[in-house]
From Swiss-Prot:
Organism: Xenopus laevis (African clawed frog)
Keyword Manganese: no
Cited InterPro entries: TRH
GO terms of molecular function: thyrotropin-releasing hormone activity
GO terms, biological process: eating behavior; histamine metabolic process; hormone-mediated signaling pathway; negative regulation of glutamate secretion; positive regulation of gamma-aminobutyric acid secretion; positive regulation of insulin secretion
Proline amide modification, residue list: P77, P91, P109, P123, P155, P170, P195
Primary gene name: trh-a
Protein name (database record): Pro-thyrotropin-releasing hormone-A
Any single Pfam family the record assigns to this protein: TRH
Region (Disordered): 107-128, 151-204
Main location: secreted
Basic and acidic residues bias locations: 112-128, 184-201
Superkingdom of the organism of origin: Eukaryota
Localization of this protein: Secreted
Length: 227
């Protein structure tokens, strides 16, 4: 902007000098005075232009906040002060909500918060929900789980199969441990007795493998002898 005014001043001085050379001089001392007047006028014009430019710059700076206010009014009410809120937040937490939203959208609807729930649980119980969903929904997988558990247990204390207990009578269900102990006790009693004086299966301390059909004839014979 200043260079333009200097060019304008130079052009006016040159034109004035040409114009003065064409006119006859009445007095010799008037020419230097005219040059000084032109220079003073050009200086005044230059100073005036600089002041006007400075005033225009100040006016633009004053109008800038008004323009920003107008833009903020045109925006959505919930997004006017978003930048100020982000500046007040912690630098490492500004985009945390956006990141969580993106991850939740990419994940399965039923598995969006599984990681948070597992982190809040006890370290030894984090996979309990996964085992229940993985094995209890499928019978074959549940049986595989039981087989794995039974292998890790003591041979005499393995978990009985659920199908075996379901087929028994509700009042006569016995565990595998009780059956094993009764069978072992019967073997020990048989070994301690004399070969010719061993107890009948329906007699002795632990009667087993007998039914009501075998007991009724013996009771009838005893009653007949008593009569």
């Amino acid at each position: 902007m200043v260079s333009v005014w200097w060019l304008l001043l130079l052009g006016t001085t040159v034109s004035h000098m040409v114009h003065t050379q064409e006119q006859p001089l009445l007095e010799e001392d008037t020419a230097p005075l005219d040059d000084l007047d032109v220079l003073e006028k050009a200086k005044g014009i230059l100073i005036r232009s600089i002041l006007e430019g400075f005033q225009e710059g100040q006016q633009n700076n004053r109008d800038l906040p008004d323009a920003m206010e107008m833009i903020s009014k045109r925006q959505h009410p919930g997004k006017r002060f978003q930048e100020e809120i982000e500046k007040r937040q912690h630098p490492g937490k500004r985009d945390l909500e956006d990141l969580n939203l993106e991850l939740s959208k990419r994940q399965h609807p039923g598995r969006r918060f599984v990681d948070d729930v597992e982190k809040r649980q006890h370290p030894g119980k984090r996979e309990e929900g996964d085992w229940s969903r993985r094995y209890l929904t499928d019978d074959s997988r549940y049986l595989d789980l039981l087989s794995d558990v039974s292998r890790r247990q003591h041979p005499g204390k393995r978990v009985p199969a659920p199908l075996f207990t379901k087929r028994q009578h509700p009042g006569k269900r016995v565990t595998e441990e009780e059956g094993d102990t009764e069978f072992e006790n019967s073997k020990e009693v048989g070994k301690r007795q004399h070969p010719g004086k061993r107890y009948d299966p329906c007699e002795g301390p632990n009667a087993y493998n007998c039914n009501s059909g075998n007991i009724l004839p013996d009771s009838v014979e005893e009653l007949s002898f008593g009569l």
